[in-house]
Design a protein with these regions (language model features):
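N-terminal membrane-targeting hydrophobic helices
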Residues: 1-171
């Protein structure tokens, strides 16, 4: 792939904003879940970035390993990364940490699979069962600015403390 397309793959700022906003939106809609409580929510945020940490981060080190590193972006690899990270916590926290991270990377994968694929296709959701990239193509890759805006707006509009402040101002 050429440097122009790889540049688009490496610096997906609206993509990262959408992932972070999806975590906040999830927390706002399911605030009673343990993974959405303050002490574990930071791990949901880490989880939404987990697939890109190695997969996209590798491009900064060496563009030649970028394609091979995409396998760290798969649910299969994310599962094992989550297991390893969870092992560093005390026994009583391992399960909530695992579920918080897993919630994050599932949100990430869900957003990624909905978009049209950049370049030849890098979402190997079914790996190691299949080497075919998968995309539902619900919105084109060029729509990430709109998706980032709409996801962030939805996260703000579902924020309970913001809703209380707005209701107080109106009353």
């Amino acid at each position: 792939f050429n440097s122009t397309s790889s540049k688009n793959l490496i610096y997906p700022v609206p993509d990262l904003i959408s992932h972070a906003a999806s975590a906040y939106l999830f927390r706002n809609l399911t605030s009673k879940l343990k993974v959405c409580q303050q002490q574990f929510f930071i791990l949901v945020l880490l989880g939404v970035f987990l697939p890109d940490l190695i997969a996209r981060g590798s491009a900064f080190l060496d563009r030649e390993i970028f394609l091979a590193a995409q396998y760290f972006h798969t649910p299969f690899a994310c599962f094992f990364q989550t297991v390893v990270i969870s092992c560093f916590f005390v026994k009583s926290q391992k399960a909530p940490v695992f579920w918080a991270l897993t919630t994050g990377w599932i949100l990430h994968q869900a957003f990624d699979i909905m978009q049209g694929v950049l370049g030849p296709g890098y979402y190997f959701i079914l790996w190691p069962l299949s080497n075919q990239s998968v995309s539902f193509g619900l919105f084109p890759d060029s729509a990430w600015y709109c998706v980032a805006f709409l996801t962030t707006l939805a996260a703000f509009l579902t924020n309970k403390s913001l809703i209380k402040k707005i209701k107080a101002k109106i009353s």
